[in-house]
C-alpha cells in the first residue's frame, strides 16, 4: 500500500543547501577554462555592437587587496551584463609594470643598482614585474572575473612602448612638449621628480618662523635699516631667497619697538604685535605696496640682496603681508620672478635633498635637518622675531610616505595651457555617473599646471630625445618614429645599451653637431604617461577593441591619476577623450570607516575571504554596497553578506526542487499568460516590474539596487507569501492540474529570468543553478541572454490583488495573536471569519475561490463584524472544527475511511 506521504509532490533537487563555495569555485574555474568560456562568449556575440570597458592597469607589485577585488569585480559585472544583453564586450586586463616601487623592492632585496649596467638592472625589474603579473592574474581569476587573461596588455611590452613614444612624438609635433627649469615636486627619498598624481597629503610638523630682512635702499620711501618681516614654514629655502613679494594695493605700516623699525602689512600689525610680545610700540608712516617696488633688502645670512617685488597672490589671511620669494622652490615665486623682475632661479639642493655650496655655511645638510641650524643662526644674528612649530597638511611621496620638496631642475614637460580649452571641452562631452564627477575632473584640468613627464630613474620608457653637440635637444617626430620601430622590434632596453649613433637613422646629420656626435636623454617617462597612453598601446592597437573606449571605471583617486593622464594624451593627439563614460568608485574602509592598515590589524584580504567563505561572498558584497562612495568591509559585514547569500541560495533551491522533481517539464508544460490563474498572473506582473527595474539598474551600473530589488522580491513576494501560499498547490494538487501548472509556470519564469539577471553578480552560483535546470540548451549560463523587458499592463488586476494582500496582512496579524493566546498552533488549525465595512473589500473577498489557500487556513467566511478590527478588515480567528485530512492537513467537515478530505480523495482516485 502506498503511504500518503509518497503521494505528495515534494521538492527534490541535487542542488545542495550549503554552497561549499571555497571547494566548488575552483571546479567552475577549471571548467570555464577548459571550455574556453571567454572565447565562446565572444563567438556567441559575434556581429553584435561592440562595448569596450578599458581596464585601468593595477601596479604589478604585491598581493591584490580588497580594493583591487572590488575594482575587478565591478568591471566583471559590466562585461558579463553587456555580453548577455546584446553586445560583444571584450575585456583585456592590463598591468602597470614600470616605476620606482619595483626598483625599490629589488634594492631592498639586496640588488645594488649602481654596481651593474642599467640593462642588467632593468632586466631584473622586468623579471620581477612579470612574476607579479602571474601572481595577481591568478588571484583575479579566482574572483570569477572573465577576460582575455592569456593576452593582457603590459606597459613593458615592446609594442606598447612603441605606441607610447609615438604618442610622445605626436605631442612633440604639436608643440606640446618642452624642456624647462621649473619648481617641481621632488622626492629626496626616491631621488626623482614626481607628478601631482604621485603626491599624497599627510600631517607634518614644520617650524614656523618670522624673519627680518634689513632694508639697504636709501630712497626715503621707508627708513633705511627697517626690517621687512617675512613668515615661512620652510627655513631651508631661505638660502634660495631672491625677493620679497608685497601686494601693490595693500597698506604697509612702519612699527617702531625697542629701538628697531619693522615693516608689516597694516592689517596684520595688532595680531603680530601680540605674537611677538610687543607691548609698547609706535606706529610710523604707512605706504602702499606699489611704492616699495624694487627696494633692496640684505639677505639675513648670505652676501647678497633681495628685491622687493609686487604680486597679486599675497594675502592677509596669515603671515605678515610680505612673502619670502624663492623662485627655485615655489611655482608662484617662479612665475613672478621670471616676469619683469628677472630674479633668476636658485635651487641650492641636490638630488638627495642636501643643500649645496650655494647655501653657504649650511652646505651638505639635509634640508629638513638644516631647518634647526638656520633658525639658530637667525636667532644669533637678531634676524629671528619668533619661532614655533605647527602641524599642517604637507605633500608626501605616495610610495615612500616621506615628505617631498619643491625644487627647480631641468625637466621635460607637457604644456597644458597649449590645449587646455580642448581638454575642458572633452570633459564636457563625457558622460559621468555621479553628479560630482564632471566638476571634479573639469576643475582639476582647469586649475592644473604643466605636467612634468620626466623621471630620473632607470626602470621605465626612455624619453626618445637626442642632443646635438651644442646641447640643443632635437625634438623631431621623424626621429621618434624611427626609435619607435626599433622599440617595437627590440624593446626599450635597446636605448640603454646602444649609443646614440646606433639609434639614429644611418647618415643622420644636424647643424648643431658639425662632428656628427650625439648624446641621448637618459631620463625616463613618468609612469602616468605609460598607463595614460594605454588607449593607444591597447585599445587602438587591438582589432577586438575600440578607441575611444566606452567606459573607464576606477577609484576616485584616478581623477588626478589615470583619468587625467589618459585624457591629456588622448586629447593631445586626437582632440577627443579616450572614454565616452566615466564611473568612479570610493575607497574600501574597515567596518568603522577607518583606513585599512597592517598596524591596525583591520586588513581584509580577498584571498583569505575566498578560502574561508568563497569569492562569491566578495562578489555579493561588491554588489551590495554603494561603490560610488567609500565602502566598508569587516568580518561582521561579511557574515551578514553570507546570511543574505544563504537566503538567495535557499530560494533557488526551493524553486529547483519544485520545478524539477520529475513532475514538470518546462519544454511542454508551460502555460501562456492568459492561461494562468489570476493570482499567478499578478505574480508575473509584479516580477516583470522587478525585471524591468533591474535592467535599468544594470544600464546605469547601480549594482546595489539590482541586488536589493531581487532580494526583496525573493524575501517578501516569494518566500514570505507566494511560496508559502503555494505549498498547498505544489505538494497536494494533481501533478498536471491547471492550478499546479499555472503556479509552476510562474516559478519557472522567476527562476529562469532571475538566475540570468544574477549571473553577472553571482557567477558561480548562477552556473550551479543552471546546471540543475535539466532542459536548458546552453553549455553555460554565461552563454545565455538576459530577459527582455515585458511589462504587463493590467492595472485592475494589480489593484485588486494589492488590496487582497493587504487583507492577508490583517489576517496574519489575527493569526499571530491567536497563536500567542494558544487558540491555535499552526495556521491550518484556524477557521477565519472576515468582515469589512468597505464594500469593495467584501466584493473582492467574495470574488476569490479558495480564500483558505490564500490565507493558509482551513476555512474562511466573509460575514458580519464580530472580531478584532485591523487596517482593512475585522478578523475573527477560532479553532477549526472537524477532521484533519491525513494528506493535506486541512481541517474539514468530513474525511473518508482513509482519512482523506474530498479534494485529496479525488486527486488520488485520478
Question: Where do the model's predicted regions map?
Answer:
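Cys/His-coordinated zinc-binding microdomains
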Residues: 514, 889-892, 905
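Residue patterns forming the tRNA-binding/recognition surfaces of aminoacyl-tRNA synthetases
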Residues: 2-14, 18-21, 27, 31-35, ...
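Secondary-structure capping and boundary motifs in well-ordered enzyme cores
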Residues: 45, 49-55, 66-70, 74, ...
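Alpha-helical recognition segments enriched in aromatics with Gly/Pro capping
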Residues: 306, 312, 340-353, 457-459, ...
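Protease-associated
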Residues: 239, 243-244, 250-322, 331-335
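N-terminal catalytic cores of NTP/NDP-binding nucleotidyl/phosphoryl-transfer enzymes
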Residues: 43-104, 164, 230-232, 236, ...
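Amphipathic alpha-helical
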Residues: 172-199, 272-283, 292, 484-513
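Acidic, turn-prone loop/beta-hairpin segments
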Residues: 96, 184, 188, 194-200, ...
Amino acid at each position: 500500500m502506498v503511504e500518503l506521504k509518497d503521494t505528495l509532490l515534494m521538492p527534490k533537487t541535487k542542488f545542495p543547501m550549503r554552497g561549499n563555495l571555497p571547494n566548488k569555485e575552483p571546479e567552475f574555474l577549471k571548467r570555464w577554462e577548459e571550455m574556453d568560456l571567454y572565447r565562446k562568449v565572444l563567438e556567441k556575440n559575434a556581429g553584435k555592437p561592440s562595448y569596450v570597458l578599458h581596464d585601468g592597469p593595477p601596479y604589478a607589485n604585491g598581493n591584490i587587496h580588497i580594493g583591487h577585488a572590488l575594482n575587478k569585480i565591478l568591471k566583471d559585472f559590466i562585461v558579463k551584463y553587456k555580453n548577455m544583453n546584446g553586445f560583444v564586450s571584450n575585456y583585456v586586463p592590463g598591468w602597470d609594470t614600470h616605476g620606482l616601487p619595483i626598483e625599490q623592492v629589488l634594492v631592498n632585496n639586496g640588488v645594488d643598482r649602481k654596481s651593474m649596467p642599467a640593462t642588467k638592472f632593468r632586466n631584473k625589474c622586468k623579471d620581477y614585474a612579470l612574476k607579479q603579473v602571474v601572481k595577481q592574474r591568478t588571484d583575479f581569476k579566482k574572483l570569477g572575473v572573465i577576460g582575455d587573461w592569456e593576452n593582457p596588455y603590459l606597459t613593458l611590452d615592446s609594442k606598447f612602448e612603441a605606441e607610447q613614444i609615438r604618442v610622445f612624438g605626436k605631442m612633440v609635433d604639436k608643440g606640446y612638449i618642452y624642456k624647462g627649469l621649473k619648481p617641481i615636486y621632488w622626492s629626496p627619498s626616491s631621488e626623482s621628480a614626481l607628478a601631482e598624481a604621485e603626491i599624497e597629503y599627510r600631517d607634518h610638523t614644520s617650524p614656523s618662523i618670522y624673519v627680518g630682512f634689513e632694508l639697504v635702499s636709501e630712497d626715503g620711501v621707508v627708513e633705511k635699516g627697517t626690517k621687512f618681516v617675512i613668515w615661512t614654514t620652510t627655513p631651508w629655502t631661505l638660502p634660495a631667497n631672491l625677493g620679497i613679494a608685497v601686494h601693490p594695493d595693500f597698506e604697509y605700516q612702519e612699527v617702531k619697538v625697542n629701538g628697531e623699525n619693522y615693516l608689516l602689512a597694516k592689517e596684520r600689525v595688532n595680531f603680530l604685535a601680540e605674537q611677538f610680545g610687543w607691548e609698547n610700540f609706535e606706529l610710523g608712516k604707512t605706504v602702499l605696496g606699489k611704492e616699495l617696488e624694487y627696494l633692496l633688502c640684505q639677505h639675513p645670512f648670505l652676501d647678497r640682496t633681495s628685491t622687493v617685488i609686487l604680486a597679486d597672490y599675497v594675502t592677509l589671511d596669515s603671515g605678515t603681508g610680505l612673502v619670502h620669494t624663492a623662485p627655485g622652490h615655489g611655482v608662484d615665486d617662479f612665475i613672478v620672478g621670471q616676469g619683469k623682475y628677472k630674479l633668476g632661479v636658485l635651487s641650492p639642493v641636490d638630488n638627495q635633498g642636501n643643500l649645496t655650496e650655494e647655501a653657504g655655511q649650511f652646505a651638505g645638510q639635509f634640508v629638513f635637518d638644516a631647518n634647526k641650524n638656520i633658525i639658530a643662526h637667525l636667532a644669533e644674528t637678531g634676524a629671528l622675531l619668533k619661532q614655533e612649530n605647527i602641524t599642517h597638511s604637507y605633500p608626501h611621496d605616495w610610495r615612500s610616505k616621506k615628505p617631498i620638496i619643491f625644487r627647480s631642475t631641468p625637466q621635460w614637460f607637457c604644456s597644458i595651457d597649449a590645449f587646455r580649452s580642448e581638454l575642458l571641452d572633452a570633459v564636457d562631452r563625457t558622460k559621468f555617473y555621479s553628479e560630482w564627477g564632471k566638476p571634479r575632473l573639469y576643475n582639476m584640468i582647469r586649475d592644473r599646471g604643466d605636467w612634468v613627464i620626466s623621471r630620473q630613474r632607470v626602470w621605465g620608457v626612455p624619453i626618445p630625445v637626442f642632443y646635438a653637440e651644442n646641447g640643443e635637444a632635437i625634438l623631431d617626430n621623424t626621429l621618434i618614429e624611427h626609435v619607435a620601430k626599433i622599440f617595437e622590434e627590440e624593446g626599450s632596453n635597446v636605448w640603454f645599451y646602444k649609443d646614440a649613433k646606433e639609434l639614429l637613422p644611418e647618415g643622420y646629420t644636424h647643424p648643431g653637431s658639425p662632428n656628427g656626435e650625439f648624446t641621448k636623454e637618459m631620463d625616463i617617462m613618468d609612469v602616468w604617461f605609460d598607463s595614460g597612453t594605454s588607449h593607444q598601446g591597447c585599445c587602438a592597437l587591438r582589432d577586438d577593441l575600440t578607441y575611444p573606449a566606452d567606459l573607464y571605471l576606477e577609484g576616485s583617486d584616478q581623477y588626478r591619476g589615470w583619468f587625467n593622464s589618459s585624457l591629456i594624451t588622448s586629447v593631445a593627439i586626437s582632440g577627443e577623450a579616450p572614454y565616452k563614460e566615466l564611473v568612479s568608485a570610493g575607497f574600501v574602509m574597515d567596518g568603522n570607516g577607518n583606513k585599512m592598515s597592517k598596524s591596525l590589524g583591520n586588513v581584509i584580504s580577498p584571498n583569505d575571504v575566498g578560502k574561508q567563505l568563497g569569492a562569491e561572498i566578495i562578489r555579493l558584497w561588491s554588489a551590495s554596497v554603494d561603490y560610488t562612495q567609500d565602502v566598508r568591509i569587516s568580518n561582521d559585514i561579511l557574515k551578514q553578506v553570507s546570511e543574505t547569500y544563504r537566503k538567495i541560495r535557499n530560494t533557488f533551491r526551493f524553486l529547483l526542487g519544485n520545478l524539477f522533481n520529475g513532475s514538470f517539464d518546462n519544454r511542454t508544460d508551460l502555460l501562456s499568460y492568459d492561461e494562468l490563474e489570476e493570482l499567478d498572473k499578478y505574480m508575473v506582473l509584479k516580477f516583470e516590474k522587478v525585471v524591468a527595474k533591474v535592467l535599468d539598474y544594470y544600464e546605469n551600473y547601480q549594482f546595489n539596487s539590482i541586488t536589493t530589488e531581487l532580494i526583496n522580491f525573493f524575501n517578501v513576494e516569494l518566500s514570505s507569501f507566494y511560496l508559502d501560499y503555494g505549498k498547498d498547490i505544489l505538494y497536494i494538487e494533481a501533478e498536471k492540474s491547471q492550478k499546479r501548472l499555472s503556479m509552476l509556470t510562474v516559478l519557472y519564469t522567476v527562476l529562469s529570468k532571475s538566475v540570468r539577471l544574477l549571473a553577472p553578480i553571482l557567477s558561480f552560483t548562477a552556473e550551479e543553478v543552471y546546471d540543475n535546470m535539466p532542459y536548458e540548451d546552453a553549455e553555460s549560463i554565461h552563454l545565455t541572454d538576459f530577459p527582455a523587458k515585458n511589462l504587463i499592463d493590467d492595472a485592475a488586476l494589480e489593484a485588486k490583488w494589492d488590496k487582497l494582500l493587504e487583507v492577508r496582512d490583517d489576517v496574519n496579524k489575527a493569526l499571530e495573536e491567536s497563536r500567542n493566546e494558544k487558540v491555535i498552533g499552526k495556521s491550518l488549525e484556524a477557521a477565519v471569519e472576515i468582515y469589512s465595512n468597505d464594500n469593495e473589500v467584501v466584493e473582492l473577498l467574495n470574488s476569490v475561490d479558495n480564500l483558505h489557500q490564500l490565507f493558509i487556513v482551513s476555512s474562511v467566511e466573509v460575514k458580519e463584524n464580530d472580531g478584532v478590527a485591523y487596517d482593512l478588515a475585522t478578523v475573527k480567528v477560532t479553532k477549526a472544527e472537524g477532521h484533519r485530512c491525513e494528506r493535506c492537513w486541512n481541517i474539514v467537515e468530513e474525511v473518508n475511511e482513509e482519512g482523506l478530505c474530498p479534494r485529496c480523495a479525488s486527486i488520488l482516485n485520478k
